[in-house]
């Protein structure tokens, strides 16, 4: 089976690769504006905007940890957050766990590569291992697909947004999910970050 983008005259090996290409800035306008103070960037999807916040590159200085806290507080019915992965705070309110900051040293060298002490993944450079340790790779998966027969868990909101926007399990078809995603957008726009 050949998957083909006729506009670009390119073939793709899988449906997901073609779908990702069709949803990229090559074919879609960057019309999702960042509401962050001092930021004038635009993105092709809400997932890309969320990733912008999570990466800490927005001039507003929004971090992944702050974003998680805002979403957990807004998702009072735990529609997209998993209460089993959250901590119970004052007055019974759920809070996302505070990420643990970890750094690897030269002692992570196993003779042929730098090895992550949590998952055994290897890296050619120590800086790459430390980037891995600072990423959400080992954080709790506090987000979940709201579709009952899917329930895939995600460590980042951007991962959940990509899952929903990509239509991987059909969850985007449900009005309630569209309402939640639109609510996230309104919430971002209401932020004074």
Listing of model-derived features with the role each one plays in the protein:
Residues 1-193:
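Alpha-helical interaction/linker modules in multidomain eukaryotic proteins
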